């Protein structure tokens, strides 16, 4: 069964989808326009809040795609992950991308296991 928990009609996408034992979470950003460290932290807060809608926490995340405007900002990621994940780290991939708005420096998409 597929359950769309949060739908963005303007962008025509679902930011949280439950599909079987997995939850797919997209477009996690926070603190737009602030320094990248604050945006990374804010993105994890957004991810955590969205996972709560599915009854999950960050410890259920098994995979993350971490998108940066500047890949050199990857140097901030590990310490912020350690702050949020308490040793239960997901696999992750980091890459650069262009964002639609100038103030966005970081975004997360994630997959969580619900089983």
Q: What annotation goes with each model-predicted range?
A:
Residues 1-62, 68-115:
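N-terminal presequence-like segments and the immediate start of the first folded domain
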């Amino acid at each position: 069964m597929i359950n769309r928990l949060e739908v963005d009609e303007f962008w025509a996408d679902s930011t949280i989808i439950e599909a079987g034992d997995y939850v797919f979470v997209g477009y996690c950003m926070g603190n737009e326009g602030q320094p990248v460290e604050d945006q990374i932290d804010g993105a994890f807060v957004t991810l955590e809040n969205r996972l709560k809608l599915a009854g999950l926490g960050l410890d259920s995340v098994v995979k993350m795609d971490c998108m940066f405007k500047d890949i050199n900002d990857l140097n901030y990621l590990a310490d912020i992950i350690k702050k949020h994940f308490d040793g239960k780290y997901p696999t992750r991939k980091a890459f650069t991308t262009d964002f639609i708005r100038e103030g966005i420096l970081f975004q997360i998409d994630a997959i969580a296991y619900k089983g």
